[in-house]
């Protein structure tokens, strides 16, 4: 980090009072950040231009963010593009739909466990009711993750428009909040064409984010996240949980001590918003307005579902999952590909690295996928308003039952938006 005008943080008199021998300016910033999180530094603000450090006391978020400690904007602790430490985060766009809402428009969501035939049912519904499909599977968002995610090929999509599919580069980070914003934009476009949106996928959190909304937290800061992950690597994953407990005990109580991802986000919100994340979550969420949501659930027989899962996994490896994984890992930035930790890709990576044999990888993927399907059903059974249909989505009889049900509810071809 360059020192531009005014001497920078390394020459600041309050920092000079600490013992940081042989530290570059960047190192000093890291040390200041870590000491603040540890609660070993206190910043006194009796006068806005006279700050001092003293060990043993925990400063408030507002005090540590005081701009006079970092007089040059280029040398503040965080300078993320959309807000950072010491700078109030800019207001997020209000979640909602583009344009005025006059009458409720229909929206279909197909839910159920993996390998239940949700994609086949979505195609049948979209074809019969003039719909467009919106993906809510977190892995299918990424380009290059095709075989392991069960992504339909262009030919298999039967000419029906698909959205939020192959829309991200492998290294891009994507949150439930990001998904909600993109999905709302897609919904507005589909509505403008007077067509029926049909959501299909397996990431229940994404669907919940669209329908129920998320708390209005600050945008993520990659710089802050990098620093927090660095602390976890140096001091262990439980370390972040202990820090969070100091700032927001209520949030820490809901997060497992070794869940680094959730701890990082909770700390990020506490720091950037200068408010405990638990308080922000308690303020409520803004749900989806202007749509009549119909949720259709597939409830396949458990034994047959497990058989289908086992067969699908075998077919994935036979179709080239190892080669797809090897190609992804051959890229220079492969370590940043979050989706490589997904089911199938994780086991295939172990084979590529020589840590697992192929038969063991297939079996491990089958067992893990069966458990995942069970968790999916548990998740969706806690969701309100789902109409369940016994069977698989690729069964023509089930497809007819679902389409007849949707028509009976008033959803017809070329929905005008009024029901």
What feature does the model see in each segment?
Residues 78-79, 97-419:
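Phosphate/pyrophosphate-binding catalytic cores of soluble transferases and nucleic-acid-acting enzymes
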Residues 1, 9, 15, 28, ...:
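Hydrophobic alpha-helical signal/anchor motif
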Residues 45-48, 67, 86:
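Short hydrophobic alpha-helical segments enriched in small aliphatic residues
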Residues 10, 21, 45-48:
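Short linear motifs in low-complexity or flexible loops
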Residues 5-8, 17, 39, 56, ...:
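Residue-identity detector for glycine
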Residues 40, 62, 70, 75-76, ...:
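Short linear segments in intrinsically disordered or otherwise low-structure-confidence regions
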């Amino acid at each position: 980090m360059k020192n531009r005008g005014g001497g920078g943080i390394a020459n600041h008199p309050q920092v000079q009072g600490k013992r940081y021998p042989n530290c570059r300016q960047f190192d000093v910033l890291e040390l200041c950040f870590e000491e603040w999180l540890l609660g070993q530094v206190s910043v006194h603000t009796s006068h806005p231009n006279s700050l001092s450090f003293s060990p043993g006391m925990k400063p408030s978020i507002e005090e540590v963010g005081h701009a006079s400690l970092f007089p040059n904007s280029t040398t503040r602790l965080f300078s993320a593009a959309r807000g950072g430490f010491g700078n109030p985060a800019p207001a997020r766009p209000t979640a909602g739909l583009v344009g005025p809402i006059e009458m409720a428009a229909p929206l279909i969501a197909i839910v159920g466990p993996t390998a239940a035939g949700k994609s086949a049912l979505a195609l049948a519904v979209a074809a019969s009711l003039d719909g467009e499909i919106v993906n809510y599977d977190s892995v299918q968002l990424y380009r290059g993750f095709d075989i392991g995610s069960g992504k339909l090929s262009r030919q298999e999509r039967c000419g029906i428009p698909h959205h939020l599919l192959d829309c991200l580069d492998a290294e891009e980070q994507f949150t439930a909040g990001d998904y909600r914003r993109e999905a709302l934009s897609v919904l507005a476009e589909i509505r403008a064409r007077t067509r029926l949106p049909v959501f299909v996928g397996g990431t229940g959190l994404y669907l919940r984010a669209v329908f129920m909304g998320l708390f209005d937290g600050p945008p993520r800061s990659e710089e802050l996240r990098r620093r927090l992950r660095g602390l976890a690597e140096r001091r262990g994953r439980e370390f972040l949980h202990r820090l969070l407990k100091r700032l927001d005990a209520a949030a820490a109580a809901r997060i497992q001590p070794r869940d680094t991802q959730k701890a990082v986000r909770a700390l990020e919100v506490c720091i950037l918003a200068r408010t405990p994340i638990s308080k922000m979550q308690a303020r409520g969420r803004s749900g989806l307005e202007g749509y009549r949501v119909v949720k259709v659930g597939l409830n396949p027989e458990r034994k047959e579902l497990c058989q289908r899962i086992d067969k699908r996994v075998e077919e994935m490896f036979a179709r080239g999952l190892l080669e797809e994984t090897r190609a992804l890992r051959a890229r220079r930035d492969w370590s940043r590909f979050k989706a490589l930790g997904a089911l199938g890709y994780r086991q295939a990576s172990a084979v590529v690295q020589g840590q697992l044999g192929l038969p063991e990888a297939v079996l491990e993927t089958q067992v893990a996928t069966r458990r995942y399907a069970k968790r999916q059903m548990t998740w969706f059974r806690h969701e309100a308003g789902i109409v369940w249909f016994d069977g698989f989505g690729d069964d023509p009889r089930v497809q007819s039952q679902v389409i007849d049900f949707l028509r009976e509810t008033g959803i017809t071809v070329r929905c005008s938006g009024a029901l």
